[in-house]
């Protein structure tokens, strides 16, 4: 493997590193974005890029040596090594929309599908009606794929879809025959990363190929479209038949993220991501699943610095649904990422499954904590909370992050109780390591509810509880002469009384770039999701692992979209989003209230979970959809202040924005968000009937607190001649002060279909005012 890697690195170095030897030492990779391509033939597009670069650098040889990528399929542009002055000069060219330096992005089951409804065991549901997503292609941009995983077996899978134009690119430990009828494509993109970084073959164990070292990409791909794998569990927990959302959909992996080392983790170059999107458009994917994202502050959706938004714009224009993770910076507000209106942005919820771990105190009180402990029962053992008894010169700390301040004898041979307010879930494993190194036998961590389970080693129990239960245990310790505790192995608990919650880590709205665009759009399970992984994953158990994040929630939606695409092949990306958002659950599948994890549990609002929890069966027959086409996106670009020439190049045709600028409130989204209501506003939506031809819908309005909402007309009539109808919404406020957001809804119903449009309104009497009071 190392010999192959060395030869690959030599070749890549000759192509990338030595190719830029003539460039200034101060040069770095810049992306030159030209918008919609002007030629259908990719060769002509690339030639035009070389001509432009030759004019800048003075020769064809210099242009060839500077070029890193030519984006030539879905859109036009290139990545090249340029100095600041060269970048500034080419940016002044009238053909160029943006020039920016390269940047980096970060990474953002057995129970899921039974929980959400489309079970493969039912002969009359979405999975069976769509032949499990057969003939749809899910493209995944991530860390690669482990092709030998059973999740990518092609048993019972038919021929490769005829619209597929991609292939399987050989590389380190990866040959073309690693692909099959399930995993039909695999490519890797590293040129952008190599142009700015030295790839240390000794330090980084990643593969210079589409093969996945980290396991993240394998996990994501198997959630979206993994094949059936029976009797899968994580070391005995969560046992069942594993499958993806669309078990017969095809997977195409585009590796643009690279594992550097344990300290630096995984990095994804913007130029590599752009090339991956460009290739995915060419190859013919139907859905593009991207579990990556930037950080706040965000760049405008019309700014090339948001590379995912830029690439996604062109993918959506070609009919590809782009699904992105909303980010893991919750529960703080205004943290959601991937906020462009043409992207389907996903929040994460829990499942109705937990891993209950009995803690039995010496007074026979039983407390059910959460853990992934699969070791033997720990019999009654001394229980301690490290604190100063009042007559000691030693240092004591019951804070989980500071357990190392305690002497070993404080914890040796005991189970330790500690408290933490930290949100970082690594606190669990770090505290457990400290206790174990000191000779401790177990750990009970009291913390705010809702944080990820971080499994400790198999033979070491570390159990999470909330602060209330932690205080109960602390009182037991303080008022008992010789406190003891017994810890039993974890067990899987499904259904009652486990409730569904928006995960604490899931990033929240409102949208910090364009507050009138509701984000996230939708929520899906993303906590402790069991799926395939790479054997190199340190938590790997038989080829499978549990991970948490909006990275896991996004491919759930991608799998649902693949099923819906099979059922409605002519729908636009906006139609799929509308169907998913307007039919979502506001309660869990069993009718219980969903909660949102924050500093405390609360009733969720659209900034927590968009339309709600995805309801795949209802999304298949939404009744009405709010559709959008390129003109709607042009409306948005104009409202965002993009100039006419830039929009024209972006969309590939002459475009002139109206004067005055259109209102962002009139974009035909399946939501209504008004961030700065002062005077009465009127907005318009258009709905299209995709249900029975002759249908009549009546409106039900639940206005936000202190907000008046008037809908005209109140009844919509559809027939063979009338497929689409517009309605107006007049919104006014009774508030006399600046308020926060209040929430309501607008529902069109024909007694069978309920088309729910979430409404979010903030009164701003004094505009652009920030108040800390």
Swiss-Prot record:
Lineage: superkingdom: Eukaryota
GO BP field: proteolysis
Propeptide: 24-108
Class in the EC hierarchy, top level: hydrolase
Glycosylation sites: 200, 231, 408, 536, 643
Active-site annotation: 142 (charge relay system), 216 (charge relay system), 551 (charge relay system)
Signal peptide coordinates: 1-23
Every Inhibitor I9 domain range: 29-108
GO cellular component: extracellular region
Positions of the Peptidase S8 domain: 112-620
GO molecular function: serine-type endopeptidase activity
PANTHER family in the record: PROPROTEIN CONVERTASE SUBTILISIN/KEXIN
Family stated for the protein in its record: Belongs to the peptidase S8 family.
Name the record gives this protein: Subtilisin-like protease SBT3.4
Organism (species): Arabidopsis thaliana
